[in-house]
UniProtKB/Swiss-Prot annotation:
GO terms for biological process: methylation. Its EC number is 2.1.1.-. Disruption phenotype: Does not affect the methylation of the naphthoquinones derived pigments and only abolishes the production of pleosporalin A but not of the 2 other final products. Keywords: Methyltransferase, S-adenosyl-L-methionine, Transferase. It comes from Aspergillus terreus. Pfam families: Methyltransf_11. One of its GO terms (molecular function) is S-adenosylmethionine-dependent methyltransferase activity. InterPro entries: Diverse_substrate_MTase, Methyltransf_11, SAM-dependent_MTases_sf. The gene is pgmE. Transmembrane segments: none annotated. It is an enzyme of class 2 (transferase). This is Methyltransferase pgmE. Pathway: Pigment biosynthesis; Secondary metabolite biosynthesis. Induction: Expression is significantly up-regulated at the end of late growth phase, in the presence of Butyrolactone I. Expression is positively regulated by the pgm cluster-specific transcription factor pgmR. Methyltransferase; part of the gene cluster that mediates the biosynthesis of pleosporalin A, ascomycone A, as well as a third cryptic naphthoquinone derived pigment, all responsible for the coloration of conidia. Essential for the production of pleosporalin A, but not the 2 other final products. The pathway begins with the biosynthesis of the cyclized heptaketide 3-acetonyl-1,6,8-trihydroxy-2-naphthaldehyde by the NR-PKS pgmA.
Amino acid sequence: MAETATRSDSGMFWKATTYKEQYWDGYLAARPKYSSDFYERIVDYYKAHNPSPPTPTVAHDVGTGPGQVASELCKYFDKVIASDPNSTHLAVASARNEKSGLNHKITWTEVSAEDLNSHYPAGSASFLAAAECLPLLDVPRALNTFAHLLHPNGTLAAWFYGRPVFSEPTVAAKCQPILNDIIDLTFEKVIKGAPPAHKTTWKRSTDTLYSFLDNVTFPAETWRDVYRFKWNPHLPLSVVGPNACDYPIEPSSCIDPEREKVVEAKDPHFWEEVWDISEVRRFVECLLPNIEDLKSKGVYDHVEVKYKELEEAMGGDNAKKEITWPVVLILATRV
């Protein structure tokens, strides 16, 4: 395969622009695994609010990335439309689903979430998933597009997870501040050196994540039965912290308590992983596909010092520690 080149399309994260399978294997291995009961919660909501959908049933996976959510949706829907603005992501997702024999159910579309309404007709979908992407979008435009795509009683499911967090309190006290420093040091040059347009995108996203998506508005004339499920909401949802940013972080909330239900749970075992230092490193480094280029230029040396510090705090090279995640899931029904 060709080496991975990178670009910064959205101003949010560096995106791979050529298909290098090794990177994507590492990316998926470094991500939390969406549990079966998590998907069941979503599907149960969909079935309860849309008992007689038009057939064939159509689901959208917006911002599909390497396509793991599209694969899961094939279990529940007749057709799946997986979209992403990055052609490399679509090539990866298509190749992976070809191996699984699922491509006959999936249509791959290169388009941004905000512009899907120019590709698909109104009311053409029963379900739309926006996994790990909503804060990275122009949210009002994206929600208008999602409302355009969904037929009445169709379901929107949007979720996001934050940085990995050490579960056990004594371990977290020693290790989490070091991991937070590693992430912030890794990203500060990307954020602080961003051009103005990208900086605006970074701030918008950071504000939304520090709000735990509570600043995402669901107008009553368009959406009903809005549920906001939060796991570990005492932990920051944003991957980057204030030290990586050179702008004020301004969380806010527009939750309507008369129309929306918020369900919170503190669960140190939610999507639990057990990681050693190499797996923690993999999570951070897979956020930036050009990490090897940064290392070769020497701009990553100060971060390596922090990794050694974290390794010692975790108990050495082979020591494994429990990891959990802050997560938010929003479910809403199209009026």
